[in-house]
UniProtKB/Swiss-Prot annotation:
Record localization: Cytoplasm
Protein modification: 4'-phosphopantetheine is transferred from CoA to a specific serine of apo-ACP by AcpS. This modification is essential for activity because fatty acids are bound in thioester linkage to the sulfhydryl of the prosthetic group.
Keyword Cytoplasm listed: yes
Protein name per Swiss-Prot or TrEMBL: Acyl carrier protein
Keywords in alphabetical order: Cytoplasm, Fatty acid biosynthesis, Fatty acid metabolism, Lipid biosynthesis, Lipid metabolism, Phosphopantetheine, Phosphoprotein
Record-stated family: Belongs to the acyl carrier protein (ACP) family.
Length: 77
C-alpha cells in the first residue's frame, strides 16, 4: 500500500471511528463505512490539510469510495 493510501486510511479511521480492517479500497464511505454528509465534508477537509491540496466541491462529490480518495490525492501530488 502506498504512503498516500496509508495516510488516507488513517484519516478515515480517525474521522469515522471505523476499524482499519473495514477501510478497503472498494469500500463506499456512505454505504460501507456509515458516513453522512457532515462526515464526508470533514474527511475532505482532513485530506486537504494532510496532503496540502485543495479539493474542489465538484471533485469532492465524485469521491465516493476509499480508492477514489487515494487516486485523487495521488494525482494532485
Amino acid at each position: 500500500m502506498s504512503d498516500v493510501a496509508e495516510k488516507v486510511k488513517k484519516i478515515i479511521v480517525d474521522q469515522l471511528g471505523v476499524s482499519a480492517d473495514e477501510v478497503k479500497p472498494e469500500a463506499s464511505f456512505v454505504e460501507d463505512l456509515g458516513a453522512d454528509s457532515l462526515d464526508l465534508t470533514e474527511l475532505i477537509m482532513a485530506m486537504e490539510e494532510e496532503f496540502e491540496v485543495e479539493i474542489a466541491d465538484e471533485d469532492a462529490q465524485k469521491i465516493l469510495k476509499v480508492q477514489d480518495a487515494i487516486a485523487y490525492i495521488e494525482e494532485k501530488k
